[in-house]
Amino acid sequence: MRIAVVNNFFPPRVGGSAHMAASLAEQYAARGHEVLAITAAYADAPADETKDGYRVVRLPAVKMPQLGLSIDFDMSFASLRPGNWRRLWKLLDEFKPDAIHLHGQFFDLSWLAGLYARRHKLPMLLTIHTLLISDNKLYGGVFRFLDSVLVNPILRYLKPRFVILDKLGVDYCVERYGTSDANSDYFPIAVDTGNFEKPLTLDVRAEHKLGDGPVIVSLGHVIPLRNRLPLVEALPSILDKHPGVKVVVVGRVYHDVFLKRAEELGVADAIIVTGAVPKADVPAYFAAADIVTHDLNGGCGTASLEAMLSGTATIASVTEDNYPGIELRNGENILLVRPDDSEAVASTVIELLDDPQKRALVAQRESAMVRANFGLDVVAEEHLRTFEKLVIEADVLR
C-alpha cells in the first residue's frame, strides 16, 4: 500500500502525537509499504528528506502567536501560507496514496488532507490525540465552542474512520463528535519499545545536580489537561515525610499556574523545570526517577506508558477499564489515583517512597503490561489490518 501520514506535529518537534505518527510511519515502511509523511515546517528541520525508509515533506507554516497568557500553545498552521493548499494536493496527486492516516482532529493539515481523501474517495483514519478540554471554565468553554462550530462540522463532512486511544477519548468523541462503534476503532497508544533498549544518553542526576535523594519526574508539556497542580499541591505532605524530594518537570510550559501555586505553597525550591528534551534523552530521565507522574488530571498518555515500560513506578489517573480489552489492576500492574486528587497523590507517593520493594515490584509489572499490550509492532499491525480492510472496501465501491 501507499500510505500518507499527516500531522502538523512531527519530529524533531517533541511530543506524544509527533512521536507516534513518526513511529507508525517507520513501522509501515519497515513492512514494505510506501510512506509519505506530510507535516508543518519546524525550526531548522529540512523541508524534504528521506529517513527511516520513508519521505518527510515539511510545508511552510505560520506560528500561532504567543499571547503571554497562562495558556499558550506552540502550534503552526500550514493553511495560512499562500500556495500550501496547491502544494499539498500536488504532493498527494504525485504520491497516489491508497489510504491516508490523519493525526489530530483540530489540525489544519488533517482537514486539508482529509478534504483530498474525501474528494478522491480514499479511506482515511483519524487518530484522536489531544482532547479539547480544560478545568478552567473560560478555556473549557472556548474549547467546547470550537469543537461545536468548527471541528465537528468539518469531521462530519470528511467522514473519517476514527482511531480512539482510551476510554477518556471514547467518551469525549461520543459527546463532541457523535462517534460510535460503526465508525471507530479502539487501538491503544503505540509505545516504541526499541527506544528503551539503547544505552542512556545522559546522567540526569549529575546534569541537574539532584544528588542521591528521591526524584519524581513529571514528563510532558504542561497544558491545561496536564497542569501538574495535583502534584504541586501534594508536595507539602510529601516533603514533610521525605524532605529531600525533588520534582523534575520535563517539557515546555504552556500553562504556568502550577509554578505560581508552588510559590504560594512554599515548595518552589523542590521543583526543577527543564523545558523540552530530545526523545533520545527521555529514557535517561525515567532511569533517574524513583517515581514518574504527570497524568494526574485524568489520563494515561504516551509519556506515562513509556515510563512504565522503562521500569519506573508510574502513577496515572484513569479507571481500570480505560483501555478496552486490556486488564489494569490498581496496585498490581498499574498505580492509579482519582483525577485532580492531591491527597491521593501524596499518600501514593509517600507509600512508594516508604516501601522500595513494593515500588520495584509494581514497576516490574507495569513494564511487562505495557510491553505485552502497547508495543509499537503490535499497534502498527492493527492499523495495517484496518487499512487493508478499508482499501478493499473502497475498491469494491469504486
Please place each PLM-identified region on the residue numbering.
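Conserved acidic donor-binding segment of nucleotide-sugar-dependent glycosyltransferases
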Residues: 329-342, 351-356
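Short hydrophobic beta-strand element within catalytic cores of glycosyltransferases
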Residues: 313-322, 335
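Donor nucleotide-sugar binding/catalytic pocket of nucleotide-sugar-dependent glycosyltransferases
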Residues: 57, 133, 144, 148-200, ...
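Nucleotide-activated donor-binding/catalytic signature segment of Leloir-type glycosyltransferases, i.e.
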Residues: 259-276
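Conserved donor-binding/catalytic core segment of Leloir-type glycosyltransferases
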Residues: 210-226, 232-235
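Short alpha-helical donor nucleotide-sugar binding micro-motif in glycosyltransferases
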Residues: 276-277, 284-289, 307-308
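N-terminal subdomain of nucleotide-sugar transferases
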Residues: 1-57, 122, 395-398
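Acidic donor-binding loop of glycosyltransferase active sites
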Residues: 99, 287-299, 312
